[in-house]
Amino acid sequence: MSSESKLIPIGIISSPYGIRGQVAIKSFTDPASNILNYELKDYRKNIIKIHSAKILSKKIICNIDQIVTRTAAEQLTRTKLYIYKHELPQLPDSEYYVANLNGIKVKNLEGEIIGKINNICNYNAGDIIEVVYNDGKKIMYPFTNEIFPQITEDFVVIVPPEFI
């Protein structure tokens, strides 16, 4: 899959809201309202057209085209919202998108490749990076500057907590 057609998740429909087909969206963008600046798609690349939205506490409450009942809104619960990777704004050299770290090499302080990033999770308390080591062992680490002191587009350097 080329980077032009690669989908990046930037939000999720978390629940129905009210009785008239509105949904609550959890945005992964910063600020959260930036999600409204994109043409959103589901995993099949179907367009999810938002025709009105308001920010309410930590949620974005939206009306989605052709969704007019709570039952229809309930069926969208847990639908991830995507954009194409090329739609993301260009970042300065010292910044990166967390989603772009998936699959890159992990090196130790000596520069040896010891594994790769297998997964990135966020449980609302910060990002967690799952590293799969060359021997197949998987370990999850909090995504902090102490544990990952160097990050490039090709690799990250890890200092596991037992060495800090």
From Swiss-Prot:
Key word Lyase present: no
Q: What is its main location?
A: cytoplasm
Keyword Cell membrane appears in the UniProt entry: no
State a single Gene Ontology molecular function: ribosome binding
Q: How does it assemble?
A: Binds ribosomal protein uS19.
Q: What functional role does this protein have?
A: An accessory protein needed during the final step in the assembly of 30S ribosomal subunit, possibly for assembly of the head region. Essential for efficient processing of 16S rRNA. May be needed both before and after RbfA during the maturation of 16S rRNA. It has affinity for free ribosomal 30S subunits but not for 70S ribosomes.
Any domain commentary?
Answer: The PRC barrel domain binds ribosomal protein uS19.
**Family under the similarity heading:** Belongs to the RimM family.
State what protein this is by name: Ribosome maturation factor RimM
- The organism named in the record is Orientia tsutsugamushi (strain Boryong) (Rickettsia tsutsugamushi)
Q: Which gene encodes it?
A: rimM
